[in-house]
């Protein structure tokens, strides 16, 4: 049995970045850049008005001064006239500040006169006010997005602003999902008293689809070697194959045996973890196989701890870790076993800090506990007891937020 940290190191060592590919900008969201991106222009590309108002020479401005309005400038048009002493140009937000002007007076601090041929300035203004200077955001040639950056809405906007209608990103892995167990029935069927619906396939697919799109539920299979073997062989066409169930020590836990029969190299099959001890990771060729415990909370936790970081590594992410919040424990926790625990928990902000309490649960089969949680409280294997008021770590995950 190995530690959580050592298991994750093995997984990340074996998960390799996928080759880069070029995609259209509109299809890049959620992917990671394979190359750094430099700006091909200054941003803003010109001295830009930050307000609706009047472009003026600051030295002219004193309360109640009257200026001649020489033109009106709107966004998308080039000024035709230079502002001289005693003059002003009416200007709109986003428009080019005309030559000669060194400040913009807000429209609410002015009074138009003589049918907009003149303007009275009601307030003194300093040089440079309400002007976004050329290149103050980004200079031409500057790296605006680094290699490994995840493309979100804001990065998409930057890519468009620097003229990229296509970008080079890392490919995403294909993911196949298999659930095993005689007790499982299709979710459209009403289970008999000794059966349960196959929820794991769908929750795993939902977790995977938060970061990749090529996710396929390959099916449910009984505790039968030949059936398991056949479906695993189909699943090995995927970059990552995830199985749930059939990995404990029971007479009908057959997944590990079938994987070995198929020539899968197993790197670990037990992790010092609760829930999720019987977690298996292996490879056949360049295909990665995760065989996760069948209890729903165990399945959820082990996906977050091992599968998600692996997917991120393959996609070119530079960071694979979940965010950690330090919070004050509201109630004492009894620690039963010397294994690291990840327990469904509820975080709440109080003042400038956080407080956390465990969600009541009935063990790793209690899927409903996850619906009430917004984090996983981490109980270190080195801790003997946790008292109310102790500071603890809580792992955040997109799947719970």
For the regions a language model picked out, list residue spans one by one.
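Short, glycine/charged-enriched hinge/interface segments at domain edges or termini
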Residues: 2, 54-216, 360, 396-398
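Short beta-strand/loop turn elements enriched in aromatics
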Residues: 23-25, 46-67, 103-116, 347-370, ...
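Generic secondary-structure signature for well-ordered alpha-helical cores
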Residues: 9-20, 34, 38, 136, ...
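Helix-rich terminal scaffold detector
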Residues: 4, 165-292, 296-302
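Flexible glycine/proline-rich
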Residues: 2, 21-26, 30, 34-35, ...
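Intrinsically disordered, low-complexity, positively charged segments
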Residues: 2-64, 151
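Short glycine-rich, flexible loops that bind phosphorylated cofactors or substrates
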Residues: 98, 153, 249-251, 298, ...
